[in-house]
């Protein structure tokens, strides 16, 4: 009976450790995905802001022609 208790305790302990490791890896994966999404958004914003002055440079003279 004592050996059965030890065996069950060992199985339970190893299962909990395994779950803990899996949860940790899952959280790390989610964090990496969030960082990648944030980087993509930053690149899109930079692209927009680099393009915006060119558009203003073209439209500006059309709206306010030189006198």
From Swiss-Prot:
The organs and tissues expressing this protein are described as: Expressed by the skin glands.
Record keyword tRNA-binding present: no
Q: Which UniProt keywords apply?
A: Amphibian defense peptide, Secreted, Signal
Which Pfam families is this protein grouped with?
A: FSAP_sig_propep
Instruction: Write out the biased-composition intervals (Acidic residues).
Output: 30-42
Where does the record say this protein resides?
A: Secreted
Instruction: From the UniProt record, list the residues forming the propeptide.
Output: 23-46
- What are the boundaries of the signal sequence? 1-22
Q: Name one GO biological process term.
A: defense response
Q: Name one GO cellular component term.
A: extracellular region
Q: Region Disordered: list its residue ranges.
A: 24-48
- The record's principal subcellular location, in a coarse class, is secreted
Q: Would the keyword ATP-binding turn up in this protein's UniProt record?
A: no
Residue spans crossing the bilayer: none
Q: Give the family per the record.
A: Belongs to the frog skin active peptide (FSAP) family. Dermaseptin subfamily.
What is this protein's name? Preprofallaxidin-4
The taxonomy runs: Eukaryota, Metazoa, Chordata, Craniata, Vertebrata
